[in-house]
Amino acid sequence: MFSYSSVCLSKILYSYGIYAPSLKAEELQRHDSDDEDGQLRVIIKVTPEGFPPLIVKIKDDRDVSETVFESQCRFSEALAESGIPTARILPVVGENRHVLNAQIDSRPVFVTAEAFMENEVRSVDVETAVKMGTLLARSHNVSEERQCHVPNKVLFDPFEDNELFYALDFLSLGDRMTGENLYLHREIALEYQRIMAELEPLHLRPKYAVQGDISDCNCFFTSDWEIGFFDFNNAGDNVLFCDAVMQGLFAARLMTYPQDRSFSDEDLVNAFFRGYCSARPFTEEDKKFYPLLRAVIDAFWVDNIGWSRGNGWAPCKPEALYAAVENEDPQAVQRRLEEIYNKLTDRRQI
């Protein structure tokens, strides 16, 4: 297992211009893969004597280059310079970069150091959703104005394999359908293809850098109770409107919420976009595309289809389509398909 010492952390801080006689370290997160991908991600809260606490990130990801890591840091700093609250990332002393190349525990790794942000957002309510939407819109404005780019794939690109809806996984189930269910599956597939053809102009829009994961655990409250964000690990280039729609539904459905919540998912969606449009109004073309993109996301939402990531399928909920297919229950399959078809042909306006 990967290990590091206080002496190692002191040397890292020295590279960032922090000279402290002692420090305290608390490991907050670790992903140390022993399989062939060999990925490593360790996040450590380091408090040097006489200095505010910092977050030191140690990474070894064979799929992400130093160029990508540095671009993510520079994008975060570009937002901060334009007034967007982020965790400031320290530059390496005497060098025009933020990512430090280091050898730790006989392993070459990339290292960054950034400010530790207090007051992490713990749950999302309507007011918080408005603020998250506003924050995202402001960051989009800066990214577009400053022509920011990060050469990395994102989680929420609706024209690629993504983390919110599984249209391609739905299509792969076609060879397990029979009778009327096979016919309905084909009708859904055709409607999906028609919608994606209509969305093609959206696909062709220019892409700009986005933070890529505006979740509760990546956001913090500022001293005046606005919201900022940190963790640009998933930052990359996306069509800004697509990022807005995907992030809005992500915030409304897959966050932590108050136990005594009195609001619906749709209340959160509307709140998020109310905040977003206050800083970056949707264009008439956006409003035309929204019902189509929303229909695809709602129909093939992860919980509707079932997980198929990694080795084989692992349905996340019993009511997922794949669960019905796996149970060889044609009536349940039909109900799921009808629900998916109804969502795909619904046209929710913004």
Question: Which ranges hold each PLM region?
Answer:
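ATP/Mg2+ or Mg2+-diphosphate-binding catalytic cores
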Residues: F300-I350
